[in-house]
Amino acid sequence: MGEQIRTDYDLLVDDPSLSCTPASVSRIWANPNSRIKITEQSDAIEISYEFFDLRRRIPVGDDSVMSDSPSTKNLSGTLFAEMGSSFAFYEGSTLIIESRNHAPGYIRTSRGIPQSPNTVAIEELEVRDGELHITHTYRDESLFEVPLVLEYSFRRIEAEDVDIYSCTDADYDWFLDLNNKSDGK
C-alpha cells in the first residue's frame, strides 16, 4: 500500500507545504536553516519551530496524558493533525516523544513517503558533545515492511527565539519555469 501511495505522489501538486501545512514532524525537523527552540515546563515539552510558525506542546507522562487533539498549532491557532498527537517521557537523559493519530500525509515530501492514522512515530532526542541528536523512527505495518529511521543533528546558536516565518501559499511555478528553460522551451 505504501509503495502505491508513493508512486501516485506528485510533488508539484501534492506537497502540503504549498498551502502552509506541515506534512509531518519529520518534514519540519528536516527543513534547513530554520530555528527550533525547545523548552521544558513542569508538565510539558514545548517546541517552537520557525518553519510555518509552529508551536508544539507535548505533555510529559505516559500515553494517558496524550490528547486526542493534535499537539501542534501555528501562531494563528490552526491545529495540524499531520503532526499527530504526542506525549513525552525520559529514559535516562534521552527525551522520547511518541506521536500517534496522524492525518494521512507524507513523512518526506520530496519522495512521497506516506504516513497514515496507523503510523506511530518515536523521536529520541539526546545531547551529545554539545549537539542535539534526534533519531526519528516511523512504524506502520500498513505502509512499511520495516520501520523508517531518520536521523538529524543540530548545533546550538546564540539566538534565544525563533523568527516569525509568516507563510503564504506558494506554488512550484519557479521550478516549472526552471525546468522549461533547461529543456530549451
Where is each model-derived feature located?
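PEST-like low-complexity, intrinsically disordered acidic/proline/serine-rich tracts
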Residues: 1-185
